[in-house]
Structures are given as structure tokens and as C-alpha cells.
């Protein structure tokens, strides 16, 4: 095949196939090859920008999408992806303007109504956000996801947990910036706080299980406490970052509750730093952890503390908060003893501390 444009088309079609199959790295290679043979082609720029967006490479995505829009200002697909990239980079006002332009061109795009609602929620415009999520439902959008968003904006009983694909997508896109943003911008310190108390006790654990391990922020601390560390997370991109640390003997892509249901016994330390804010209801987690732990085993975790007395609440930030009484009840029901509790901010949100609970339990 000697015709450069024909070669570019072949790479482009292969990129579309890879993208649809979720093979993002392969899609990136194919679209990059197509762009080299057909520089400036808006369709290639748009799709490569979409891939880079999903890979968490937001600045690169934005540059590609803006180049596409310079040629096709009314490209609704490029507008939508560009808006999403701006939202990921913390520019919600600019993102909203592009979402509105895209939806004026293609009002039936349910996913854009959902993303628009998220941006409005971030801007503190709750009623408009709710209307956008409702419009997404009317256009045939993801029922579970939009109901979850709407629950965070209402006083309705919250769903039992965040949709799995929401969490996976959120952290896949966040992986490249996660550590710096969480630790530096949001003053996140849960891994150190949770493990510091264990280190002071001087106990050596055989096997530690890091639930929702993310990029591995707990890993270096756990490596000093345990002979072997296993990490579980939904996000493949997060696990790839954790793998590079070398702190984990095993890393598995799995839902926390589903993994615990089938997990082998023998973990004498189970830790969950800032994880239950997406798990929601914790009945199954406590039941399975109690089964996995041997007598004397340790279970420690951080929570956002519910401020209105509700055992379980879904906040407008779309994170769950839990009450101390809820945890005490679950501990009692599952043969776990509350050894220590500390109240301290779990992180900051819009430069305001988020009240948190840090809890250390042991199996009786």
C-alpha cells in the first residue's frame, strides 16, 4: 500500500477498532501513525485527542482537540472532548461553554448532558446540574450513573455504592496527576496517618491487603510493616503506577467488595485509605474482612464523617460519608473491636478541610 492517504485510513480504522475494544495504547499508536501520514486531519486529531483524554494526558488531548476545532469550529465531537479535557484540568467555566456549544449542535448526545451536569455541580449550580442529569436520562443516557449523580444532589436515599464504571473511568483519567494533586493540592495524608499508629506498636505483619490501592501511596509504608503486600484497585492505569513502586508482591484489578468475597484467609492487615467514599454501604466489606482476618488481625481505614447523623450519606461531591455509630454497629456485628479512633481532615476541598474519621479495628 503506497498511497499515504490510503495508509493513513488503514491506521485510522485500526485505531477506531482498538478504541472501541478499550485497547487505548494500541489506539494511540494507530492514530499517531495516521496523523503522521495525514497531518492536520480533523477526524484523526479528534480521535487521538479522545484517546489521550482517556489516558489521562489532558494537556496533549487539549492541544490536539483545539487544532481540530481551529479547522472545524462546529465539530460537536471535538467540542465535547475538548470540554471534557478542560473539566479534567480544573477549568469548569471554560468547559461549560464548550459543552453548551456541542449540545446546541447535537442535543441528543446524552453523555454530554451528563458531563455538563458534573461541571455545573462543580460550579455549585446544583439545580441546573440536576436538570442536566435529568436531560441525560431523557436522551437515553446511563441510568445508573445519572441516578447516582441525582442522588448526590437530593435528599433521596443514596444508592448502595458508586457505579463501577464511574469509579474506573474517574481514576483511569486521574492516574497521571493523582499523587501530586491529592498530596500537594488536597493535603492528603491518610496513608501515613493510618500506618504511623501501626508502626508505633512495633508489630510485624505477615500479609497486608491494600484495598483500593490506587497509585500505591500506602505501599512504601506497608512494605515496612508486612512481609508481603497485595494491592487491589479498579483502575488499570492506577495499578500500572503502583507496579512501578516495587512495594507490592501482587497487584490485581478488581472491585473491592467482589475481591473480598472470594479472597483467601490469611491477611493479618487490611487497610483502606480514602476508599470507602466510593464503596458506600459497608455491610459486605465488614463481613468479608472479618472472615479474611485471623484473630488479632488489624483492619484500619479512613472515612469522610457524616455531619447530619445519617449512617450513610452521598454528598454533592459524589463521595459517601459515614457516621461513627454506623462503623461501631458493623464492627460489633462482625466480631471486630474498635481499638482507636481519630478525628482529623481526610483532605481539603476548595481549600476547606473535610472532616474525617481514622479508625483501627482488630478481630476479637
Question: Predicted segments — roles?
Answer:
Residues 8-9, 42-43, 76-77, 110-111, ...:
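Helix-start (N-cap) detector for alpha-helical repeat units in TPR-like alpha-solenoids
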Residues 209, 214-259:
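Class I SAM-dependent methyltransferase SAM/SAH-binding core
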Residues 271:
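A conserved beta-strand element that flanks and buttresses the S-adenosyl-L-methionine
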Residues 283-295:
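A short glycine-rich, Lys/Arg-flanked "PGG" loop and its adjoining helix->strand segment in the class I
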Residues 296-304:
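Conserved beta-strand signature within the Rossmann-like core of class I S-adenosyl-L-methionine
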